[in-house]
Amino acid sequence: MERGLHLGAAAASEDDLFLHKSLGTSAAKRLEAAFRSTPPGMDLSLAPPTRERPASSSSPLGCFEPADPEGAGLRLPPPGGGGGASGGGGGVSVPGLLVGSAGVGGEPSLSSLPAGAALCLKYGESAGRGSVAESSGGEQSPDDDSDGLCELVLRAGGPDPRASPRAGGGSAKVAEGCSNAHLHGGSGLPPGGPTSGGGSGGGGGGSSKKSKEQKALRLNINARERRRMHDLNDALDELRAVIPYAHSPSVRKLSKIATLLLAKNYILMQAQALEEMRRLVAYLNQGQAISAASLPSSAAAAAAAAALHPALGAYEQAAGYPFSAGLPPAASCPEKCALFNSVSSSLCKQCTEKP
């Protein structure tokens, strides 16, 4: 019984090894084609350097060696069976694949199959999808170079080369932006940034200069207005000094309007007094031809003149008129001038000129 079990286990291990060898041959071809041939649109210049395999390695298991130096990839149990911790810890890493104790890709449905068979099934599905998407003409077999592993590598390392032209245009724009940033020293500012900043600085300088000019003009206007007001006040003070009733001790200082009104009334009064003086001089000039019969008429004229202006009451001559009808006018001329002693001597000019 035990011998039969040992023979059955040995036969199963031999079948598993044969299946794994056949899988290794086909997988090696696909992996080599995927890593050696660069599809259009894929740039491997930024990809991490791969470790070179020794040329003497002709084992079909060489394709399962780790392709990246960091060992990124997941573990594959060795082809000899050995479950438990020895099967999980002693495997080799395959980039982009997940093969463990739970099956391929973490699927429990494939955990009952041997590792090689599960891997073969997974590769078959991926190859079918990749061949339909990337075929340029005719049908491709699952053993062809275009498999799902290349798609996984491209998606992990860079953008998909089968993307739309719109996405390609976007990447070209990004590259152009990066080149512009390098050309401008990596400052991140647009080319017109410093120029626009200088223009704003120049505008600020112009506005400050304009404000200074306006301030100087305003100061000049204020100074001129101050001088004008000072001159006006001085002129009004001189006018108050001339007006008789403006500088009295009992009268407070008049305002500007009151000073101007008082000056107007004083000028009108002086004009009226001058007119009365002219009438009196005309009357004196006509007195040489006056007779005794004309005395009442002259007295009436003097009364009318006194009624016009009270100041002329001192010049009233009706009561004590010094002239008489029988006296010559030459004898009465000095007496007439003596009555008007307050008037200037030019009024009696005719008395001094006559013999």
Swiss-Prot record:
GO MF annotations, alphabetized: chromatin binding; DNA-binding transcription factor activity, RNA polymerase II-specific; identical protein binding; protein dimerization activity
GO biological process: amacrine cell differentiation; anterior commissure morphogenesis; central nervous system projection neuron axonogenesis; cerebral cortex regionalization; corpus callosum morphogenesis; corticospinal tract morphogenesis; GABAergic neuron differentiation; negative regulation of DNA-templated transcription
UniProt xrefs under Pfam families: HLH
Gene3D superfamilies hit by this protein: Helix-loop-helix DNA-binding domain
Biased composition (Gly residues): 81-90, 185-207
Gene ablation phenotype (knockout): Null mice exhibits aberrant expression of brain area-specific genes and structural organization in the somatosensory and caudal motor cortices. In somatosensory cortex, vibrissal barrels display postsynaptic disorganization. In caudal motor cortex, anomalous differentiation of corticospinal motor neurons is observed, accompanied by failure of corticospinal tract formation. Mice also develop self-inflicted skin lesions and show significantly enhanced scratching responses to pruritic agents, due to the selective loss of a subset of spinal cord inhibitory interneurons.
UniProt cross-references to CDD domains, sorted A to Z: bHLH_TS_bHLHe22_bHLHb5
Main location: nucleus
Subcellular location, record wording: Nucleus
GO cellular component: nucleoplasm; nucleus
Region (Disordered): 34-90, 128-215
UniProt KW keywords: Neurogenesis, Nucleus, Repressor, Transcription, Transcription regulation
Tissues in which the UniProt entry reports expression: Brain-specific, with the highest expression in the cerebellum.
Sequence ranges assigned to domain bHLH in this UniProt record: 216-270
Subunit structure: Interacts with PRDM8.
Function: Inhibits DNA binding of TCF3/E47 homodimers and TCF3 (E47)/NEUROD1 heterodimers and acts as a strong repressor of Neurod1 and Myod-responsive genes, probably by heterodimerization with class a basic helix-loop-helix factors. Despite the presence of an intact basic domain, does not bind to DNA. In the brain, may function as an area-specific transcription factor that regulates the postmitotic acquisition of area identities and elucidate the genetic hierarchy between progenitors and postmitotic neurons driving neocortical arealization.
Protein name, entry field: Class E basic helix-loop-helix protein 22
Organism expressing this protein natively: Mus musculus
Taxonomic placement: Eukaryota, Metazoa, Chordata, Craniata, Vertebrata
Gene behind the chain: Bhlhe22
